[in-house]
Structures are given as structure tokens and as C-alpha cells.
Amino acid sequence: MSCSVSLSFPDGSKRDYHSEMTGLELAESISKSLAKKALAYSLNGIIRDLSDPIKQSGQIEIITREDTRALELIRHDCAHVLAEAVQELFPGTQVTIGPVIENGFYYDFARQQPFTLDDLTIIEKKMREIIQRNKPFRKEVWSRKKAREIFSEKGELYKVELIDSIPDNQDLKVYYQGDWFDLCRGPHMQSTGQIGNAFKLMKVAGAYWRGDANNPMLTRIYGTAFANENDLKAYLHMLEEAEKRDHRRLGREMNLFHFQEEGPGMIFWHKKGWKMFQNLINYMRRRLDDHQYAEVNAPQVLDRSLWEISGHWEWYKENMFKAIPAAEDWDNENVYALKPMNCPGHVQIFKHGLKSYRDLPTRIAEFGVVHRYEPSGSLHGLMRVRCFTQDDAHIFCTDEQLADECLNINDLILSTYADFGFKEISLKLSTRPEKRVGSDALWDHAENIMESVLKTIETKSAGQIKTSILPGEGAFYGPKFEYTLKDAIGREWQCGTTQLDFNLPERFNAFYIDKDSEKRQPVMIHRAIFGSMERFLGILIENFSGHMPLWFAPEQIVVATITSEANEYAKKLTAKLKSVGLSTTLDLRNEKINYKIREHSLQKVPVILVCGKRESETNSVNMRRLGSTEQIFLSVEEVIEQLKNEATPPDLRRVINA
């Protein structure tokens, strides 16, 4: 019995088909060249194998190598080829899982002898052989009994465990590539040959089965793959550049911070690192003041009862650090927790004292220190820690004020990123997930407002801000905006958020009195610009490769002497520079000037002013900029005039120049 489906194509055309043709047959009906290039097809946003029949009407697209969605298919197939190569080369190795991740893929293997970096070269060679064989991917659907029996016979105990964990009503799909097969949901491309040669195995690491330290340790092989060689080369070059810019290495060289075993994920800030951190806070404090935020501070330790009301105790307890009063055991009901988030405390501040509609919008901000438990293996310098500071704010407003508040937040976020040199920003709106609080009418209303705001932002930016909508990706308590910035070497960092919350005001019975003297629940907006300030500082260090803008540098200027004859002049010069607000350090050490210059350059000091006998006699300096070999002779007045504006933060510069 034939089935009629109506398909809409990307060019706007529509066509009816009177049989359950496959995706490949559809591609062939359009053109032979398209069928040859086709990797998969998308029906109503869901990517499927080309061998799958088209059983329903909707929006259809044939995915080729040029499509951005092809990258996930290429990497997914590459992970399967990696697993086959390993089992060909190292019989007895068990395969476990091999997902696609950001910028690549990995596969975890169970083997008595862990793999080494030398093994990767051999495995990669075998992968190229398998790809060259150009074996078709073929899907079969098995019963649970059959899958269990076959994988048990193969000695694949981890696969058997996975089979047992799959819900009874879910199909068990197995994909073949030649004789080798693996349990997999799919989809896959037509054959291994479509993977191409633009891939590379990157590293070996240990990983616990299912991420649980109580389970066996596996060996994880990481790899990456791209649609073409040029993209692979560009990515590998970016990794080389990222290694040079690694904030952990620069943090040591610049003497900014360190970590110790006694405090995993806890930062020991040194003088210059702490100065940089304070520069970040001072900048944001001024911006908050300009946008009428009230800065507050809520307790770091609160009773579990508050976290139970907020829902954190139920949903986030495993990531919270708990505390108890002295001499009381853990079974005691009187348990406290270090705050993992600032929002419950801010709701308490809003609730303190009766609020009228005339008090709204109320904007509450805090540089709130939070503690969150992260597994030790996931800790990564400033980027992933257990204790960090959020530039957190919460806005309580009326429904009518929501759009204006979102636009106000957007202006603050974009201008902040621009002040730090980030020009390429993307903005995503995440909408309702399946599991959520609040009525459909409430979500409809909120999403309509935020979509309108999104269009306004896109129009105002003249297309410079890339916007998109992510259906189903919102939090259970409200839709959200996510701001992602691109750094100097093309990496993307998600930082800012604007998150609506239908949940907390209701849980805590937060209200205001409207103009009709009725109690109303306020609209609550969670807002962050930097997110984790420590992480943002790590991003800045890597973005600038430690060469911070003069206004943000922890040490702006060093005055270095060539000879002791210039010491008195250098002291007076340092005092004068400090008097006009320039952060200046004096170096009178009895060392050669080239040694001093090299040392301060390694410390990434933006400006070095060299003073010798000639400079002291002519009231001048020899100025050297970080990264330049040029020597510029200037009078002291010229130096001050040139550096003072540059050393002024951009937000203050705007006020001065207004």
C-alpha cells in the first residue's frame, strides 16, 4: 500500500510523493550528483539515515558535506571506525561508548594495558585503511534477547550492561560497517568512505565507566574530524595557539595565582592576579551604578530549609558543600550549606519590606562567592573551579516592564564585551522544554516577548549580532537568552545569560502590591554578564595572551634604570606618574638593563620606561612597548599625555569625552 507524503524543500517548493521512498531515493530523484554527495537527510529537524523511508510529511533537507550538520555525522562515524580499528589491532579489547563532543569525539575502551601515545599512530593508520575499504553502514533492529546474547558471546560486558539499561519500549539498533558492528542509536552516513581523511587522534586519558569513581577505569581515546583538510589544519593551528596562550602557564609566568592539593579548585590569588580581579570588579561596579542596580551581599552559609524551599536541596544537593555546627553529626537535622547560587538570597532581600509597583523594576546585584562541587578530573585552572565569584543580578519587574528590562540588560552586556575588545557576539533564545513549570499561556506570553526582543536586538545591531532560537533548550522554570563571544583565535565562550524564572518567586511567595492594591507575583530575571568572574578572567588572559590592555593591566608601567646615577631621577619620575593615576613600579636593581627588560616583558608589563644618565639630564625617557623592539624617546609630559588616556577604563573614557 503506497503512502502519500507532502514534502517542503529549502527553496520553498513543495511536492507530493506517492510511495515510501528512502532519503537516498529522494536525492536520486532530484539529481545523481546530489545523491552521490548526500550523507543523510533531515525531516522536520530530525536527522535520519538515507536508507530510512520517508514516512511523514514535513520540511525535508538533504544533508551534504557542506552542511554544518554534517560535522556531527562525520565525527560520529569516525568514532565507530576508531572502535573497529582498535579491536582489529588489539583483540580482546572491549568497547564501551563513543559519543561526539565539542570539537571532536572520543571512545572509551576496556583493556588491561592502557593505550599510549605511540599506539595512536598505529590506530590512526588502521582507521585510514578501514575508511579506504568504503564499507556501507547498515542498520538492523534487534530484540533485547538477541542483542544480549550476541554481545555476551563477544565478551562485550559493558555493552550488555548498556542493553540492560535501555528502556523496554525502546528499539535496540545495531549498525554494521562490513562485518564489524556496534550498538548505536544512529544516524550514520552511507559508508565509511564518506568520512574522508580530515581526522586526527589527539590524546589518551583515563575515564571511569559511566563517570563513577567506584567503577573500573577505562582508557579514553580522543579524536577530531572535519569536512576537509583545511578546516582540520586551521583547528590544529588554533590548538597550538591556544597552548601558547594557556592561562595556567601565563598565570605562573606572570605570577598571578596558583593552586594547591590542599584546596582543589580553590584559587590562591597573588598580588598582581588579585589586582586584575579587582579591576574587573571595579569596572563592573561602575557599570552597575550607571544602570541603577543596588549592590547587595547575602550570606554564604544558609540553613538547609531555605535550600529545600528553593528546590536546590532536591535537585542540586550532590553539587553542594554542606556544613554543620561544631560537634554536631551529619544525621542532625540542623544542616547548613554553602550557597551554590545567589538567587535565593536575593529573593529574601526583595521580600524584606513591602514592595509597591512603584518600586519596580528592582535591580539587585552581587559579586557573590559560590561553592559548587566539581569532580577533581574536571577542574581546569580558572575555567573550572569549586569556588568562584558570579557577577550575579536579579531583576524583579512587572510583566509590562519585561521587554524593556531585557533590552536594558542586552545593552549592558554588549557594551561590556565591546569594552574588553569582543566584537563577534551571538545570541540564542532557548525555549520551553518538555518538563517545565508554569502554564502554556504563561510560556507563550514570555516567549513572544523574548522573540520580539530578539528581533529588536538583531535589527539594532544591523545583523552584526548573530541570533538563533533553540527549541526545547530552556530551563524548566523559564526561557533564556545566552550570549556567546568569539575570542582572538576563533574560540567561542558562552558567558552572559538573561533567564526568566517562573519558579522561585512562587516558591518563596515573593510579591508586590499593584496599583489596585492587589498582591502580584513579580517577573524575576536572572542576569549574568561575566558568569564566573574567574573564568572570564581566564578568557581575557588567553584572548590577550597575557598582554592586557593598559587600563586593565595589574602593573601598567615599570621605570627601569640603566645606572645608579639615574636612581634619583627615576624615583621622582615614578612619583609623578603615580600622582596622575598611572600604576608604576620602580626597578633600581643592580642588573643589566637587557635583563630587566626581558624579565618585565615575561611578566607582560605593557610599558617599560628606561632611564639612564641622558634621560635624567634631559627630563625624558626611553619608552618600550610590550611586543615591540622600537625605542621611543619622549619627554615626561609627552609620556603622561600619551599613556593617561590609554590607562583610563573605556567606560570612564566615554564620560570624559561626552
UniProtKB/Swiss-Prot annotation:
Subunit structure and binding partners: Homodimer.
GO (cellular component) term, any one: cytosol
Keywords recorded for this protein, A-Z: Aminoacyl-tRNA synthetase, ATP-binding, Cytoplasm, Ligase, Metal-binding, Nucleotide-binding, Protein biosynthesis, RNA-binding, tRNA-binding, Zinc
Cofactor dependence: Zn(2+)
InterPro entries documented for this protein: aa-tRNA-synt_IIb (IPR002314), aa-tRNA-synth_II (IPR006195), aa-tRNA-synth_II/BPL/LPL (IPR045864), Anticodon-bd (IPR004154), Anticodon-bd_dom_sf (IPR036621), Beta-grasp_dom_sf (IPR012675), TGS (IPR004095), TGS-like (IPR012676)
EC class name: ligase
GO biological-process terms attached to the record: threonyl-tRNA aminoacylation
Catalytic activity: tRNA(Thr) + L-threonine + ATP = L-threonyl-tRNA(Thr) + AMP + diphosphate + H(+)
CDD domains for this protein: TGS_ThrRS, ThrRS_anticodon, ThrRS_core
Recorded family membership: Belongs to the class-II aminoacyl-tRNA synthetase family.
Purpose: Catalyzes the attachment of threonine to tRNA(Thr) in a two-step reaction: L-threonine is first activated by ATP to form Thr-AMP and then transferred to the acceptor end of tRNA(Thr). Also edits incorrectly charged L-seryl-tRNA(Thr).
Record flagged with keyword tRNA-binding: yes
Region ranges (Catalytic): 246-549
Domain TGS: 1-64
Species of origin: Bartonella henselae (strain ATCC 49882 / DSM 28221 / CCUG 30454 / Houston 1) (Rochalimaea henselae)
Protein name as it appears in the record: Threonine--tRNA ligase
Gene Ontology molecular functions: ATP binding; metal ion binding; threonine-tRNA ligase activity; tRNA binding
Cellular localisation: Cytoplasm
Residues binding Zn(2+): 343, 394, 526
Cofactor note: Binds 1 zinc ion per subunit.
Name of encoding gene: thrS
EC number: 6.1.1.3
Taxonomy, superkingdom: Bacteria
